Amino acid sequence: MNWRNYGELMIDTIDFAKKWDKPDLVVGIARSGIIPATILALHWNVSLCSLQDYINGQFSMGCGLRYQDPKEIKNVMIVDDSIHMGGTIAEAKRLVKKANFNHKVGWAVIYADDDKDYENIIFHKTIRQGRLFQWNWTSHKEMLSHSVWDIDGCMCVKPTVEQNDDGEKYRKFLLNAPPLYLPQYPINGIVTSRLEKFRPETEQWLKKHNVKYKELIMLNYPTGRSR
């Protein structure tokens, strides 16, 4: 599995920026492309906007540098975090072509699937499938369908020592635990050290947060102390 976290994305994006002349405007393809686009705009000290705002002629996200006159913009770089089949950028190119701006537009991604020609899209590194990124792994449908998750410290926060009393305080925690990372698609299963006797509360929480799974495996011990 090829994994990239936020820190590695930051480093790779800055390394990418050093190889290219700065544009007048950086455009991020939402959602994931907004992250490297923001890093690039800050590094180059240029204006930033989302693809949708760009298409609508709003060349600023409303803070920091901005262009009062669109005629000031000569070069634009449109950025996404990665490319695989190229469908997202193909759609973005269609929208940009339809907008019919007069300035020069370049296309870039930080990570490509391989070294093939992506139709004038520049990229920084090759990271092959299967790959997961910290900033969007919960929405990776294919990977999630084969994955097995824990709950405490993963889907939700861990209970405090006071909450973890194996009684009513713990039951209240199980029903109301603040979520952390929730899968956006069905997962293969859940394995937890929670006790079997707390299955009703656990299943209620999972249903409340729309977590879909095939199997929930819990520990069959009478008390937390006996685990």
State where each predicted segment sits.
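His/Asp/Glu-enriched short active-site or ligand-binding loop at hydrolase and phosphoryl-transfer sites
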Residues: 41, 213-227
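PRPP-associated nucleotide enzymes
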Residues: 1-149, 154-184, 196-212
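Short, well-structured secondary-structure segments
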Residues: 187-199, 214-219
